[in-house]
């Protein structure tokens, strides 16, 4: 026997690999048809309903269809990874960035999925597009009992980029320098 899945999956082969572990089946026993409907933007990066449908179908021995209305979809789908972070940024009087220190913590929810990769990618890009001769970055992905988090548009960059861009605005204000000039000088 085997199982056949139709789902709006972004990576059907990864889904097959994960479902084979969940169901203790050979990957050859699982066929996944990915619907090419709509944009991804992270919502189809992790498996959502596939494990629930697969287990139900396998146990019941018949076809199962899971459908979420709009409200259920918002409740069930992954949420953006919340970051808590502290930044220290040094610049000289002319606006040259000298150092950037980041300590970041990401609430990746109760179990692994793509959320740890999302957090790691955000931390890896904590300096944005700017040149800092000295950097110190520390990040920890923390498992909690909060909502399941995952991939969203920006893939972890938005959270720390918001902090960095806000930091640069504060530096420009303190130096009485144009915000765009500060950024252009440090690309």
Kindly give the residue locations of the regions a language model identified.
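Structural alpha/beta core scaffold segments of enzyme domains
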Residues: 1-187
């Amino acid at each position: 026997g085997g199982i056949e899945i139709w789902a709006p999956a972004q990576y059907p082969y990864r889904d097959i690999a994960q479902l084979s572990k969940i169901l203790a089946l050979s990957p050859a026993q699982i066929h996944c048809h990915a619907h090419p409907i709509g944009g991804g933007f992270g919502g189809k990066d992790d498996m959502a309903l596939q494990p629930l449908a697969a287990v139900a179908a396998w146990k019941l021995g018949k076809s199962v269809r899971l459908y979420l209305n709009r409200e259920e979809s918002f409740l069930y789908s992954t949420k953006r990874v919340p970051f808590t972070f502290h930044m220290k940024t040094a610049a000289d009087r002319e606006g040259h960035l000298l150092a950037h220190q980041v300590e970041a913590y990401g609430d990746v929810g109760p179990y692994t999925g793509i959320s740890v990769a999302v957090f790691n990618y955000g931390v890896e890009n904590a300096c944005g597009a700017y040149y800092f001769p000295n950097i110190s970055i520390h990040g920890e992905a923390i498992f909690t009992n909060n909502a399941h988090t995952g991939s969203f548009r920006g893939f972890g960059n938005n959270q720390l980029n918001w902090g960095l861009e806000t930091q640069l605005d504060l530096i420009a204000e303190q130096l009485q320098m144009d915000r765009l000039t500060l950024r252009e000088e440090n690309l």
